[in-house]
Amino acid sequence: MACRLYLALIFSCVYLICLSSQQETGFVYNGFEQADLFIDGIAKILPDGLLQLTNTTELQMGHAFFKKPFDFDPSSSLSFYTHFVCALVPPKLGADGGHGIVFVVSPSIDLSHAYATQYLGVFSNLTNGTSSSHLLAIELDTVKTVEFNELEKPHVGIDLNSPISVESALPSYFSNALGKNISINLLSGEPIQVWVDYDGSFLNVTLAPIEIKKPNQPLISRAINLSEIFQEKMYVGFSSSTGNLLSNHYILGWSFSRRKEQLQSLNLSTLPRVPLPKEEKKKLSPLLIGLVILLVIPVVMVLGGVYWYRRKKYAEVKEWWEKEYGPHRFSYKSLYKATNGFRKDCRVGKGGFGEVYKGTLPGGRHIAVKRLSHDAEQGMKQFVAEVVTMGNLQHRNLVPLLGYCRRKCELLLVSEYMPNGSLDQYLFHEGNPSPSWYQRISILKDIASALSYLHTGTKQVVLHRDIKASNVMLDSEFNGRLGDFGMAKFHDRGTNLSATAAVGTIGYMAPELITMGTSMKTDVYAFGAFLLEVICGRRPVEPELPVGKQYLVKWVYECWKEACLFKTRDPRLGVEFLPEEVEMVLKLGLLCTNAMPESRPAMEQVVQYLNQDLPLPIFSPSTPGIGAFMPVSMEALSAIGVSSVRNSSVSMFVTHTILDGHGR
C-alpha cells in the first residue's frame, strides 16, 4: 500500500513538473485555425485563420484569451515576453475608427462586466483604479478620451487597473538605420508588429511595421513592479471594442512565453492577409459627365497628335528592292528601345560614318547598332544589297551581321556585340594585359581561317580590303572574329573585280593596289602586315621612329638579313613561346607581303602553314620581292581619292562591328 502511494506521489510530481514546463514554454500561433482560445463577444476566427476581435457594429466588444492560465508566483522570478501582429481597419481608409486593441494580462477570462467604447472591453466605472482588479493592459487606442487625460492623437499606453495610462506615447518605431523615430498610422489598415517585454523590473513596449525587424529601442520603457499587481495565476489575451466610431480589429499571429529565450518567432510570411475595405463607387452627376466629355475631347486630340508624331518618328522607308531582304530588317522602334533611345551612356564607339551603340533585345541578346546617315539613293541600294548578302555568311570567326534598318535619312546596321573589344586595344594600350603567345597565334589562325573562307568558301569571292588589328574583334572567349565589312567587295568566281577606288590603311595596302586594283592577293598582303603587327607588337607604319624602323615590313626584313630576326618580336611576349614557331610566323609575314603578287601564298596555304600542316617554302632575304617594300604614300592616295589615314581607315562604307569604347 505504501509502495502504491509512493508511486502515485511520483506520478503526480512528474505531471506537475510537465504542466509547469508547458506553461513556461508558452505558445505560438501563425494564424489561429487550430488555436486553443477562449472567445466571447463578437470576436471570431475567420476561415483563413484571422482572429477578428470586432467588426463594424456599434457599441460592441470582443475578447480572445489563451485558455490556460500562466504561473506568475510573486515569490519566483516574474517575467514574460510576447510578440503579436495586429491590424486596425476603419470602414474607410483614411477615416477615423474606434476604439482600439488591448493586450491584457488578467486574473480571469470573464470580462463581461467591462464596458465597450473608451473602456476597450477591459475596464468599467465600478472597477476603475481599484487594486483588486489586478489588470495590466497595453492599449493601442485610436480615440482621444478627455476624462482619461489622453493624448490628442491615437496613442499607445500602459494601463494598470485603470483606463488612465501610467505611461503613453504617440505610435512610432525607432529606425535603426536612420537613428530616429518614425511615426506609425494605427488606422492605416496595414499589419503592425507589437512586442511587450517584462524582465521583472522594466516593461518595454515596441512597435514596428510588418516589414521591419524589431527596433533596438522600445517606444515605451517603464519601471514597474508587477508582483504587486499580478496574482499567482494570470490569463493572457486580447480585448477590443467599438463605440460610435467603428473599426475591424484583427490579430494575425501571436507568440508568448514566460522566458525570453523560449519565445518562438512568428513566421511573418505565412500570416493571413488583412481584408481592406472596398472603395464605394460613386455615381457621376450629369454635370460631371458633361465636364468629363469636354475634357476628354481635347485629350483625345492630343493623344491622336502624339500617335501621329510617333508614327512619323518611327516611320521606315521601304522600297521594292528591299523586299527580298525582309528577314534581315529590324524595326526602328525595336532598335530605339534596345539602345534606350540611343542615349549617350549606351554609345560605345564613333566612326567616320556614324556612331556605335550597345543595345539589348527583349530576349536578352546584346547587339551593336551602327547609326549612319545617307543621301545617295543608288549608293545606299548597293550598300544594303552587299551588307545583307554578308548577313548570309556563316563562319565562326566572322562577326555576325544580324541585319539593318532604314528610316528616312538613316541606316542602322545591327551586329553581334563583342564584349572584349578589338585586338589593337590589347596590343597597343598599356592599360590592358598583353596577349600571350598562345592567344596571339590562336587569333592569327582564327583570322586566317575567316579570310580563307571569304576567298574560297562562299558562292562569290569576298574581298575584305581592310584587314588590321582594329578590325579584329574578340568574343567572350577571346577568339578572333573578323569584322568591319564596310570596304568589302564581291565578285563572281572566274571574273575580275571592276576597277574601284583604292581603299585601305597605310601599311596594309599592297604596292600594286593603285595600278592593278583589288584582288585576293591584296588581302593576303594586308594579312601579312597584320601578322607582323601581332607578333612584333607595333603598327605597320610609325613615322615618329627612326628612318630604319618606320616601316614594319622593311625593318623585319633588314633584321632577318642581319641574322637578328628574333629581336623583332614583341618584348611583352615573355618567355613562354617556341622560338622556331615565332621565326616561322615572322617569315610567313614576309612571304605574304612579297612585292610580287604572284609570289604570295593563297589564304588556304597560309592556314596550312600556321597549323603546321604544310612546311613553309624555303626562301631567303635575296628571294625576289621579299623585303622590297614600296610604301603607298599619302600623296599618291590623295591623287586617286583614297579615304585613308595612318592607324585607322575611314571606310568607303560603314563598319558594322563594335569596338568596346573605341570606334573606327
Swiss-Prot record:
Residues the record marks as carrying a glycan: N55, N125, N128, N181, N204, N225, N267
Extracellular side: 22-286
Disruption phenotype: Increased susceptibility to the fungus Alternaria brassicicola.
Active site: D466 (proton acceptor)
Domain Protein kinase, first and last residues per copy: 342-619
Residues that hold ATP according to the record: V348, G349, K350, G351, G352, F353, G354, E355, V356, K370
Signal sequence interval, chain numbering: 1-21
Induction remark: By salt and ethylene (ET).
Annotated GO biological process: cellular response to ethylene stimulus; cellular response to salt stress; defense response to fungus; protein autophosphorylation
Pfam families in the cross-refs: Lectin_legB, Pkinase
A molecular function GO annotation: carbohydrate binding
InterPro entries: ConA-like_dom_sf, Kinase-like_dom_sf, L-type_Lectin-RKs, Legume_lectin_dom, Prot_kinase_dom, Protein_kinase_ATP_BS, Ser/Thr_kinase_AS
Post-translation changes: Autophosphorylated on Ser and Thr residues.
Keyword Transmembrane: yes
Homology family: In the C-terminal section; belongs to the protein kinase superfamily. Ser/Thr protein kinase family.
Protein name according to UniProt: L-type lectin-domain containing receptor kinase I.3
